[in-house]
Amino acid sequence: TEEEIRRSAERLFTTRYLLGLFDHSSLDEIPYNVVGCKEHRELAYQAAVESCVLLKNDGTLPLSLKDNKRMAVIGPNADSHAALVGNYNGTPPRSITVVEGITRICEDTGWDVTYAEGCLLYDDPSVRKVFQNYRIPEAVALAESCDLAIVCVGLDSTLEGEQGDV
């Protein structure tokens, strides 16, 4: 009933108020030009590089961009800004998707970079099935026609986290 919803909302927001979740935080006043400054970007880059784990390398990495080749970047997370943030994040001042970054790196190398979504992260009823069904065959054909395929799959912050109902 409406009364039950009201009581539940009061309990929820009273608890959040008592926890201080509505209090002013000095962290809210840090401007983007500080958050996204060169020093912080370099530190974030260093943390990312040092935290990468390579489980197996059969001579594939590091990639050589000297030869002119074709590269496929495939997957719903390859061109997703939502996939770049976790569920405990602030709003980044800027972000570069995997396909954007790879395209920028390869601009002057002669590599041809092509992107294919491959699939959706979840079944979206607003997208007609006819449009969903072509994605995987398109991605497979692209991968077969390229010298290298980078596949970006997994979850993003819209699908994983806390306090979410599916």
Put a short name on every predicted segment.
Residues T1-E2, R6, T14, E42-V166:
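C-terminal non-catalytic regions of proteins with extracellular/luminal or membrane-system context
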Residues E10, T14-N33, C37:
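Conserved, charged catalytic cores of large soluble enzymes
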